[in-house]
Amino acid sequence: MAFAPKVIVVPIDLSEHSRKALASAADLGVCFHSRLVVLTVIEDRFPYPDLFSFDHPTEDFYKVMRERAHEELKKLIEHLPHIKAQADLYITRGRPAEKIVEVAAKEKADLIVMGTHGTSGLSHALLGSVCDKVIRQAPCPVLVVRHSAHE
């Protein structure tokens, strides 16, 4: 039996690494006529709370973050017109690894395609651990896309 993913989950944090993963997932989606679930997770906790002027983000803060994420995802999809009709945008809040695995299970994903690093300054330590957790807990295969040969 050949591997032909019908549902591909693509976690996006708007970093160059995740944009590269989206482009790769889009190409796979075209080849296999897959539906893409483009997912952004808004963290509900901050790794460095001392950098913020508030202890706990408000619902208004999350609303603004959600709206911005939605606009950015729409722009990304518009730059990949061959997948526009086959992509569902999914924005959720929580811990990234947990939410990626949860959405993959809920959507009955056949594949998760994600980048190697994220937007954090400690990209390898933080998203590397997200990627590692997803690989260990995912209900389906995970394809990790490197940004360049210089990583």
Language-model-derived ranges and their functions:
Residues R68, I91-R95, H117:
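Short beta->alpha linker loops
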Residues E102-E151:
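Gly/Ser-rich helix-loop-strand patches that form or flank binding pockets
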